[in-house]
Amino acid sequence: MGLERVVVIGLGVSGRSIARFLAQKGVCVLGVDKSLHALQNCPYIQEKYLENEEFPSQVDYVVRSPGVSKEHPWVQAAIASHIPVMTDIQLAFQTEKFTERESLAITGTTGKTTTILFLEYLFKRSGIPAFAMGNVGIPILDGMQNPGVRIVEISSFQLADQEKSYPVLSGGMILNISDNHLDYHGNFSEYFQAKQNLALCMRNPDDLWVGDERFYGHLYLEEVQKYMRLLDKESALKPLYLHDKHNYCCAYLLAKIEFPISETSFIEAVATFNKPPHRMEYLGQKQGIHYINDSKATTVSATETALLGVGNQAIVILGGRNKGCTFSSLLPALRKAAKSVVAMGECAQEIARDLEEFPVTVVKNLSEALLCAEEQAVPGDVIVLSPACASFDQFRSYEERGAMFKHLVGMEEVLL
């Protein structure tokens, strides 16, 4: 590999991980980014290019960071020149290390991170070394060096290029599929196909399981329902949202492919697991009004799921940057769960048009949205931030948006 010349497109967290991995293998790394600062601060690249420069010659293959679109001009230039294009997932799956021990992967539209982290927690609590990596935060090329079971969160961005078969996974789960990232994939068919590409990574195709009966009724696991009923019988458990129960049960089924973890251990793990923040995070109540931070709900389907767990007196804060979805599909869930909507941000007017049959107030930003919601609320109501949109119109991330909501609510103070 020492003579290979490899282009890495995008030098964020994943891109730097890719460049570091390749440099350690003796590859000549050519880095490309829209930011000169990113290029200057990546010590692993031998040649630096801004993305508006011409595609270089004598390139063996291209590795794009997960967030870099297949329509990127350098990706298109590589394809036109019949140069292979891949992501860090394919690069990792080609290494011998990935066949040395058990590796599990989860993809889906919503719930991936919570499910991955619960699965890691379940393993560790059962005395089984495990390490979560991939889209969950630790790039796969860094995380695969850790001991124990590999648990990989894979996004549709990373699966979109999956054309070859890399049979390295001992188990896989497609949690669910609904409209998402259509601004990236172009249409639902392309997004749907990207998720299904996980099948190309399985050692045994029978160990790819599906948690969504809408698209895979014949493959849907009856065991999911069985273990959800098991959790329902456990009166000692704290109340669980329906989607959380579903995700925990999917994780348990995936764990049991290789390890005989008991139902008792599973129930104890559910009882003691703390979800990551910004996912139907109950903040408390003030003057009888309850507050929920669901900033992670960046899709219409995620908000639909959230509305299943908020009763029927919710004031829902929607808005941000649309990811290519329509909001009218929220109407059935809103009619059951909400009394009104406050629409904010870049696509607030679009939300108001799509939901014209429902009470909607349009505001500029999150601060105004919370103030408007509180003016409408009475004791017993729930104000829930579940935007159904990306955050990038006004925030750097959904985490920043959620943190701002918590600050505005006054979570730092005693709310109960």
Swiss-Prot record:
EC nos: 6.3.2.9
Primary localization class, coarse: cytoplasm
GO molecular function, one term: UDP-N-acetylmuramoylalanine-D-glutamate ligase activity
Highest taxon in the source lineage: Bacteria
Subcellular location: Cytoplasm
Catalysed transformations (reactions): UDP-N-acetyl-alpha-D-muramoyl-L-alanine + D-glutamate + ATP = UDP-N-acetyl-alpha-D-muramoyl-L-alanyl-D-glutamate + ADP + phosphate + H(+)
InterPro entries: Mur-like_cat_sf (IPR036565), Mur_ligase_C (IPR004101), Mur_ligase_C_dom_sf (IPR036615), Mur_ligase_cen (IPR013221), MurD (IPR005762)
Residues binding ATP: 108-114
Gene3D superfamilies (alphabetical): Mur ligase, C-terminal domain, Mur-like, catalytic domain, NAD(P)-binding Rossmann-like Domain
Keywords per UniProt: ATP-binding, Cell cycle, Cell division, Cell shape, Cell wall biogenesis/degradation, Cytoplasm, Ligase, Nucleotide-binding, Peptidoglycan synthesis
Class in the EC hierarchy, top level: ligase
GO cellular component annotations of the record: cytoplasm
GO biological process terms, semicolon-separated: cell division; cell wall organization; peptidoglycan biosynthetic process; regulation of cell shape
Keyword Cytoplasm applies: yes
Pathway, per record: Cell wall biogenesis; peptidoglycan biosynthesis
UniProt record similarity statement: Belongs to the MurCDEF family.
Function: Cell wall formation. Catalyzes the addition of glutamate to the nucleotide precursor UDP-N-acetylmuramoyl-L-alanine (UMA).
Protein name: UDP-N-acetylmuramoylalanine--D-glutamate ligase
Gene transcribed to yield this protein: murD
